[in-house]
């Protein structure tokens, strides 16, 4: 395991890069389902990487060191700020254990709370959850978590559950002062007042790789969506072959059968719903099962799920009917809809 004893910021950045690789690369001990997904880090608003030592005898004490970074408005990562972690816990654990931690800050408010206050108590005002594992979890329901903080812990090379409730991330002001050669607060570091240091080049290289992996995964997912849409389009039912021909000019309906209303039929060869039933108060409404994009003038465009008012219809579902949607009137294939 890595050294939990506080050291200079250059060493902490080097340690953080090593820990991130161990948490995200597939090895003989880490299969594809045992790594931090690239998109979790790519979407993170902030990130803390630490080594922690835990000692227990009736009461457990936890302490360690590491760094924290924040995502800047331009999408780049800030310079690192040195941090420590401290906490107490109950239980009857006896012994000493060293662990590596990766803490994902999912919201800007979690980053701001640390940056402005110089410390952040986990589980206080922010919900903490064990982070998801596996590189193919982008669409997984479990990722729709509202947790402000994800935690990952490795002990003896294996992922392990760890409760960080009550643990506090603490700003190491003196370490930052020595590295940046000035009195500077975590707030200024995390909000971009100093450039990325060359001494942390290895760390930024691996952080940027997560964004590249995530974008590649996103492109692959989009290609799958396009392929699904193309397959779906090919599976659309065939449209009726013969189309009704519009009258020029439209034919006036029998005024007596329409309650003395002056209405006109654009497609007189289609039977009027009102003429057949005499029901003026309850027009037929159908719901689109498929999307239909008109290919000729007079076609009625609609999306799957749209509700269409039927103006004229035939007795066959494999035919063209006339309908009205969002103020537009036109004909559509009846086998693309279902009666409500």
UniProtKB/Swiss-Prot annotation:
Pfam families: SH3_9, Ysc84. Residues 226-237 have a biased composition (Basic and acidic residues). One of its GO terms (biological process) is phosphatidylinositol biosynthetic process. Keywords: SH3 domain. This is SH3 domain-containing YSC84-like protein 1. SMART domains: SH3. Belongs to the SH3YL1 family. Expressed in skin, kidney, stomach, small intestine and colon. Highly expressed in the anagen hair follicle. In hair, it is expressed predominantly in the hair bulb, the hair shaft, inner root sheath, and outer root sheath in the lower half of the follicle. Residues 226-259 are annotated as: Disordered. One of its GO terms (molecular function) is phosphatidylinositol binding. Interacts with SH3D19. Residues 281-340 form the SH3 domain. Residues 238-249 have a biased composition (Pro residues). GO terms for cellular component: ruffle membrane. Signal peptide: none annotated.
